[in-house]
């Protein structure tokens, strides 16, 4: 799934040696499946790991964690180390980061859900400076949403998603089986809570 060159492994181990014990690496994709997709790597401590949704890839002396929804976008990824006149940097090449596989009947259901999010959900989220957008729908009826603004990094996002948005979507669209969040959450001043 993910290949890391020997030089990149040594470099990552060196970087991790300067962090707290138990720190690993998280790989993510912002705006996956769009022309704006960007891959990234970040430090990941044990408290940041979601055992239910994160997939672990073990390497010598460290692990790499990827949210299960990001796996298709990071298929055949290569992490390498590049040295040039400006210094050394890690590169992450992900050939599928910008590719989105749309499911059957996506267009009709997509439009209905987008309209519902725009008229029923986003007006409430906008009160907190946030919004949500439809990201994808699978053949099995799983809806993927991406949060932004005040919702990104908000500590209440799981409750908002599961107790609010998911219940309303399933009630209004019986073909939906569940709703998942694909947002790469970063807490900050922009976050509502």
From Swiss-Prot:
One of its GO terms (biological process) is iron-sulfur cluster assembly. This is Fe/S biogenesis protein NfuA. Pfam families: Fe-S_biosyn, NifU. Binds 1 [4Fe-4S] cluster per subunit. The cluster is presumably bound at the interface of two monomers. Keywords: 4Fe-4S, Iron, Iron-sulfur, Metal-binding. The keyword Transferase does not apply. The keyword Iron-sulfur applies. Involved in iron-sulfur cluster biogenesis. Binds a 4Fe-4S cluster, can transfer this cluster to apoproteins, and thereby intervenes in the maturation of Fe/S proteins. Could also act as a scaffold/chaperone for damaged Fe/S proteins. It comes from the Bacteria. Belongs to the NfuA family. InterPro entries: Fe/S_biogenesis_protein_NfuA, FeS_biogenesis, FSCA_dom_sf, HesB-like_dom_sf, NIF_FeS_clus_asmbl_NifU_C. The gene is nfuA. It comes from Buchnera aphidicola subsp. Cinara cedri (strain Cc). Its cofactor is [4Fe-4S] cluster. GO terms for molecular function: 4 iron, 4 sulfur cluster binding; iron ion binding. HAMAP family: Fe_S_biogen_NfuA.
